[in-house]
Amino acid sequence: MPEPTQKPAKEPVRAPIKEHFQLRETIVTIAADDPAHIEAAKEAIRVHRATLETYILADPYFQFTLEPYECPENAPEVVRRMVKAGNTMGIGPMSAVAGTISALAVEAMVKAGAKYAIVDNGGDIALINDRSVVVGIYAGQSPIKNLGLIFEPRDSITGVCTSAGTVGPSISFGMADAAAIFSDDVSLADAAATALGNEVGIGKEAVEVAFKVVKTVQGIKGALVIQGEYIGMWGKVPKITRAEVRHEYITKA
């Protein structure tokens, strides 16, 4: 009589390695399964940040303009991505700096073999994940707290970038406690989050009207806004769940 077959036990999913990394104003949290993948991200950040600094030394206007900017065709990759994203949204290229650095870092991790890689650059996040990931949205003093978004497993890079007029040091001309954009173009997500945040006033109607700035932009999957006691969503937004979101968890870039 044959022995009954037994299914092999599933190996437990190990917790990812997390590391905080700071290079001058760039402060990131990196998550991966392999220390080598984290090192790949750190090296990419060093290289692309140095390239960006060199470009800004040659043209300081790039850093300070809040308007669309034209760059030469032979400009560095980091510059071209930022310019394209900012111009798409009708704002300056620095609106996309954090998301662009995050994306370039995750791309380097993927080249190093990563199937699970997350870089959080001050709330501007690039990720690729072979298992579900919950990303928390921090909305400052809003009563809408402990909000998480479930990113299902995927084999390509995507992004979620957040801007706020009431939280953090970044420039915003609006009153959003959180304005988040979902896009596979992480540079675009960053610039669009800035543009969306700029549009948010106070109250329910102000939240509803703000989405007009992103509704017609190709490449944007969805958007979410929290303003005080109000929350609004447009397009395709990841499934919402409860998540423990504390201020000290936020990468302060």
Curated annotation (Swiss-Prot):
<dbReference type="InterPro" id="IPR007183">
    <property type="entry name" value="UPF0280"/>
</dbReference>
<dbReference type="InterPro" id="IPR037456">
    <property type="entry name" value="MA1715-like"/>
</dbReference>
<comment type="similarity">
    <text>Belongs to the UPF0280 family.</text>
</comment>
<protein>
    <recommendedName>
        <fullName>UPF0280 protein MA_1715</fullName>
    </recommendedName>
</protein>
<dbReference type="InterPro" id="IPR003374">
    <property type="entry name" value="ApbE-like_sf"/>
</dbReference>
